Amino acid sequence: MSDAKYKLIKHAQIHWSDQLEPFSSLFDDIYFNTEQGIDEANYVFFDGNKLGKRWLDYSAQHFSIAETGFGTGLNFLLTCQKFAEFIKLNPNNPLKKLHFSSFEKYPLTKPDLIIALQQWPQLTAFITPLLAQYPIALKGCHRLVLNEFNITLDLWFGDIADTLPSLHVYDCGLFDCWYLDGFAPSKNPEMWNDDLFQLISQSCKKDATIATFTAASFVRKGLIKAGFEMGKQKGYDKKREMLIGHISTEALAANKLKQHGQYYRPAKSENTAQKKTDVAIIGGGIASACLSLALIRRGYKVTLYCKESSLAFGASGNQQAALYPLLNEQHDALSQFFANAFLYSRNYIKQINQTQPVDYSFSGVLQLYYDPSASKKLDKILQAGLPQELVEQLTEIETDNIAGISIAQKSLHYPLGGWLSPKQLVEAIVRQAKNEGDLSVHLNQELLTFEQSPSDNPALNPAQPINSWDLHFAKHSIQHSLLVLATANNTLNFKQCEAVPLSAARGQVTHIPTNHKINPLQITLCHEGYLTPANNQQHCMGATFKRHDLNQAFSQQEQVDNKDKLEKCIPGKTWTEQIDINHPNAHVGIRCTTRDHFPYVGAIPDYQATKIHYKNAAKEVNPVNAPFHPNLYLLTGLGSRGFCSAPLLAEMLASQINKEPLPFAKEILNAMQINRQWINYLKKGKPLHY
């Protein structure tokens, strides 16, 4: 049996009353009462946490709520409604953004969720985007964004006993408020326990509150033991009592002492005394575009510097790119990352397209069984037992029927996959960012060097931003308080990043004119290369992979190589033979890759300090805090799947900069940190040779 089996998510088993009230067959309990569900939820959770008054008095930009048990999403939807009303009535209040994290072990199927939410037409404005983005049953965090209302939902699928400890908690805490919901303690005793209460306590910010419908004595005592000051108040309607409380100052102090150092991330928050609203991003591809929009939506002023004469000039400049996840048999951290990032990217592209039209089609992707090695690899992916909505096997006949042309091979079908226009998407995202906030774009500006500003001494210059950076271009220099490099392989040109383990690979994509033989192709084909359906009378066929080759000149031989790969993998078909490559229509880009396929995202570590800091790492049991350059970040190493991963990676980095909950478990976060290979070597007692 595959190691992935224990990571699979099971759906809730629902049966319905005559009044369409959903009941859980597993827990023998009701999700909500159709007559009183809204009033009870508002009374227990919104009023119980005194959110109306707290939002009015709140001085920060974003407020974070966590919930045990997403269920039908009613608590989330009602909170959305309350928050939208609050923003409308208080447009000048500092609070602008709501972050809601919910933990669900047995998510409803989408059809069941649709039925359940039909009860609440007054919540349609929030139900519609929820249903549009509702994920398939995959383990981990699914980030859903309601841009119109400035609300983000992190929907964590899995046992909260596993998922909650996997969250990265800042030293200032993570959540302002907890909804302790779920089925009654008598029905679901496994969830309601002291371990959970302690984890909830450790996630709390200063002044965090908690509310729950139950008044069970062991719940009250468990929360008190975990560091909450608890009280009782009148329960809703006929219920005698319910519990409310807040985190104690003693618990906050004790929780800080329990925090362990991080090998891969700084455990301490950076200086927040001065808001770092001025961000410089270096780059011109999908990573820099997505990050620009993510930071704009958080109120930052962003300046984008691109060394080329246009955006999407490099690897992001192809006419078409395939979109599908990188999966494996174990459905390990890498597979989970790409699966959930893929689902987020789909939603992201559809949302961008609503205001900035982009050519794309989610008509599916086929991975072909073109030789024994590929067949073995694809069969292993199937053994993971992932949902058919994500990946399924097709017979030869089914493959031909769905492709629209003759292939005569089995395939793996990704029904949600497809293709998109990379250059159009990058340009659309940047236009959207300009429409939503303060983004300035500077082309033909190559960053040569940068260093920490020498005047960063608040005692000498109180008006100077703390830990800002001086950026030096060919004809001028400028200062920004925060710097992000989204510079692909050019990252290695900067002294602060010279030791980052990156590789470069040249790739040429052939643009081929359609004809009557190939035009019927309805779906993207992936083999050793790929072939897209026609867009504007043209297909994309690719791509070559020339490791360490930085030459960006057109190559006729690589046109031939792309066609040869297609004919080798799909032999004996007249339609492949009639593809015309006798022209210079192609795009050459340099991919930036990492050895383990994980990208690099996060704060940039100090390499020299790391060698000193971790010289005894092989003997230490507990890690110490890793040394990082202040206010300096990296987003690179996206490889050939940047359009699958970049939107969620940008969200993650913007969330980290803004001290919001992150959309990845620690296992995935650690795997994406820049210093991961350095630390692994040092922990094994091996020297770093750079």
UniProtKB/Swiss-Prot annotation:
Enumerate the UniProt keywords alphabetically.
Answer: Cytoplasm, FAD, Flavoprotein, Methyltransferase, Multifunctional enzyme, Oxidoreductase, S-adenosyl-L-methionine, Transferase, tRNA processing
- Lineage, broadest ranks: Bacteria, Pseudomonadati, Pseudomonadota, Gammaproteobacteria, Alteromonadales
Q: Which reaction does it catalyse?
A: 5-aminomethyl-2-thiouridine(34) in tRNA + S-adenosyl-L-methionine = 5-methylaminomethyl-2-thiouridine(34) in tRNA + S-adenosyl-L-homocysteine + H(+)
What name appears for this protein in its UniProt entry? Answer: tRNA 5-methylaminomethyl-2-thiouridine biosynthesis bifunctional protein MnmC
Recorded GO molecular functions are:
flavin adenine dinucleotide binding; oxidoreductase activity, acting on the CH-NH group of donors; tRNA (5-methylaminomethyl-2-thiouridylate)(34)-methyltransferase activity
User: Chief location of this protein?
Assistant: cytoplasm
Q: Whose protein is this, by species?
A: Psychromonas ingrahamii (strain DSM 17664 / CCUG 51855 / 37)
One GO biological process term is: methylation
Q: Does the keyword Phosphoprotein apply?
A: no
